[in-house]
Amino acid sequence: HILALDTAQEDCGAAILLADGSLFMHVEHVGSRHSERLLPMVRDLIHEAGIEKTDLGLIAFGEGPGSFTGLRVACGAAQGLAWALEVPVAQVSNLEALAEWLRETHLEAVRPGTRIAVLNDARMHECYAGMWRVPAAAEDRLERLDGPVLVAPEDAQTYLERFKADMLCGSGSKVYSEAMKIRSDGGIRMVNAADSHPDAIARIARRMALSGGTIRPELAHPVYVRNRVALTMAERAAGERL
């Protein structure tokens, strides 16, 4: 059984994927209260799934990019649980999780070779970007073509054209819609998506476990992308956020 944690954005999410494919998931909008809500959410999920904590065989978490504080919450919780249970960790790109969610929920539009772009709001007038290609076999993991990288909203159209994107999702296209000026005649299908997808993280983690992609808890780490990981006191007082 796999437990997946996602605290990369203002939502807090957790999911349990059982060995038989059954899924249990909770997602809440918590702002910056991830550290308060994550573990109670996990306890509720374990009870709902009808298992014991010791039945978990893998702990997965969204590695980022995303909110720096949020990423540390999920990473720390995953490490602590994995150490206590003596199980491995799978760290999954939050951008890939969005692409995987799109792949799973838009079967009528996704084909082998379809290129999925993800643009998430990175604040400071930037987006976290990544690009994936759908493989021929449905059971295989998405093929990463690029990312995660930082892209200015004004450069989004160029980025999408460079990698010949077929579909696009992520919060960046909503937050910076005017600056992006993505052409409606460009053949790119834009899909609205929620921020948190612990279910997709769990499914990717299952593929990682089968291919030997898990790690020891002490090796788990957030992926920030941006080097600037903290605000000054003045910036915090002014209401700025990373």
Role assignments for model-derived ranges:
Residues 47-54, 82-92, 109-111:
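Phosphate-handling active-site elements
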Residues 1-63:
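N-terminal beta-alpha supersecondary unit
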Residues 29-37, 68-72, 76, 192-196:
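Residues at secondary-structure transition points
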Residues 189-242:
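Acyltransferase
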Residues 33, 88-196, 224, 229-230, ...:
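Surface "functional belts" at beta-alpha junctions
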